[in-house]
Structures are given as C-alpha cells and as structure tokens.
C-alpha cells in the first residue's frame, strides 16, 4: 500500500523535533544528499524580499492647488533649483526620491502633504 503525500505530511507533523532531525539524517544517508544546500537556497529567498522592503520611492502624484508651497517643499527636500523643482512639480506624477528609508519617505510625504500635494510611497 502506497502512502499519499497528505498521509506523509500528517505523520511528520505528529513527530517531535528530535524525531524529525533523526528522520532528516536518515534520509540524507539513504539518498546521499545534504539538506544544508536546500536550507541555504530557502534562506536566500526571504532575505531578498526583506531587502526590497527597506527601500522606498516617494512619488508626487499631484501638486494640488498650492503649487508654490509644493515647489518650495520639493526644493527643500531634493536640493533642486527653482526651475527644476517647478518642472518636476508640473510633470506630476513624478518620482521625487528613490531608494530611501521608510522613515525618510514618511517624513517627506508628511512635509509635501502639509504643503498641499498628494504623495504616494511605493
């Protein structure tokens, strides 16, 4: 009689941690493989996902009614000149800053929203 995958999973789930370690060791010996290589590959996946979440882009979605205040806020945040900041604000939606920390992105969003802009963090 052949066991289904579900039956195998249930049997493993009912084992203690030490019994599972013994099972893994026995499987490594029987099949001549190492579970360490698989663990390294699995560990690399979540690290990349976490790395992506540490950098954020601040997007100016709309300048709103008070463009002058938004232009001043953009100049202060980006260090752009008056003409460059004005062009950026008028070309909304546009990326203001890319690859910044969450705290910096939130602070920039708050500053621009207080000036009347609509801002997105991606």
UniProtKB/Swiss-Prot annotation:
User: SUPFAM superfamilies recorded for this chain?
Assistant: ClpS-like (SSF54736), Ribosomal protein L7/12, oligomerisation (N-terminal) domain (SSF48300)
Q: Which GO terms describe its biological process?
A: translation
Question: What does the entry list under GO cellular component?
Answer: cytosolic large ribosomal subunit
Single Gene Ontology MF annotation = mRNA binding
Q: InterPro entries given for it?
A: Ribosomal_bL12, Ribosomal_bL12_C, Ribosomal_bL12_C/ClpS-like, Ribosomal_bL12_oligo, Ribosomal_bL12_oligo_N_sf
Which keywords appear in this protein's UniProt record, sorted alphabetically? Ribonucleoprotein, Ribosomal protein
The cross-references to Gene3D superfamilies, in alphabetical order and at most eight, read: 3.30.1390.10, Single helix bin (1.20.5.710)
Summary of subunit composition and partner proteins: Homodimer. Part of the ribosomal stalk of the 50S ribosomal subunit. Forms a multimeric L10(L12)X complex, where L10 forms an elongated spine to which 2 to 4 L12 dimers bind in a sequential fashion. Binds GTP-bound translation factors.
Q: Which family does it belong to?
A: Belongs to the bacterial ribosomal protein bL12 family.
Function according to Swiss-Prot or TrEMBL = Forms part of the ribosomal stalk which helps the ribosome interact with GTP-bound translation factors. Is thus essential for accurate translation.
Name of the molecule in the record: Large ribosomal subunit protein bL12
- Give me the gene this protein comes from: rplL
């Amino acid at each position: 009689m052949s066991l289904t995958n579900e039956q195998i999973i249930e049997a493993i789930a009912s084992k203690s941690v030490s019994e599972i370690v013994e099972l893994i060791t026995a499987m490594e010996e029987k099949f001549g493989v190492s579970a360490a290589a698989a663990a390294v590959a699995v560990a690399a996946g979540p690290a990349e996902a976490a790395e992506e979440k540490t950098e954020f882009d601040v997007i100016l979605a709309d300048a709103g009614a008070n463009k002058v205040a938004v232009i001043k806020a953009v100049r202060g945040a980006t260090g752009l000149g008056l003409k460059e900041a004005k062009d950026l604000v008028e070309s909304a939606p546009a990326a203001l800053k890319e690859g910044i920390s969450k705290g910096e992105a939130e602070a920039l969003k708050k500053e621009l929203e207080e000036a009347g802009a609509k801002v997105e963090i991606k």
